[in-house]
Amino acid sequence: MKKEKAVVVFSGGQDSTTCLFWAIQQFEEVEAVTFNYNQRHKLEIDCAVEIAKELGIKHTILDMSLLNQLAPNALTRTDMEITHEEGELPSTFVDGRNLLFLSFAAVLAKQVGARHIVTGVCETDFSGYPDCRDVFVKSLNVTLNLSMDYPFVIHTPLMWIDKAETWKLSDELGAFEFVREKTLTCYNGIIGDGCGECPACQLRKAGLDTYLQEREGASN
């Protein structure tokens, strides 16, 4: 364990909660930051608050509602359908979201004396989001270091693993049941296994089913 402090970009979903448990094992002190950008389901923020409280993690919520003014999308607007047409970005993509989130997380991290930032972005299950790519994160890391003259390190524990491997990681961290029962991934705002129909739920379930099959096979 590093005797240092980390800030986790935290939404209360499967990926960021797995990253939170990862950070707790990696760093002596961990804080979480959640962004309120008027997302479709306010339950996401409530979920993040409850998880942080249960784990005894200091938790900051930042108002990023300006994102909805700049880039209306299906994650913030109930009148927009969740779609993903071939050759186009998904309607759930929010222009500049991870750029802004990581930048503000870095400002917060510096203020609280942390140089490590942890985020659950992932290129393996790449959903067409350009701001989930490794090259983007590495580029932004350099930019943030230059902009604040501060040695930030952005950690992406999930970058090269798929959803099944993310479930495996949560199991290795002793957090499998916690993540399965208490996180919110569903675009329709249903905690745990979700609605089973939206793209996020389908990806989560496919990964879970694959991992459970692998785990069962390994135990036989």
UniProtKB/Swiss-Prot annotation:
Keywords: ATP-binding, Ligase, Metal-binding, Nucleotide-binding, Queuosine biosynthesis, Zinc. GO terms for biological process: queuosine biosynthetic process. Pathway: Purine metabolism; 7-cyano-7-deazaguanine biosynthesis. ATP binds at residues 10-20. Transmembrane segments: none annotated. Pfam families: QueC (PF06508). One of its GO terms (molecular function) is ATP binding. The keyword 4Fe-4S does not apply. Catalyzes the ATP-dependent conversion of 7-carboxy-7-deazaguanine (CDG) to 7-cyano-7-deazaguanine (preQ(0)). Belongs to the QueC family. This is 7-cyano-7-deazaguanine synthase. The lineage of its organism: Bacteria, Bacillati, Bacillota, Bacilli, Bacillales.
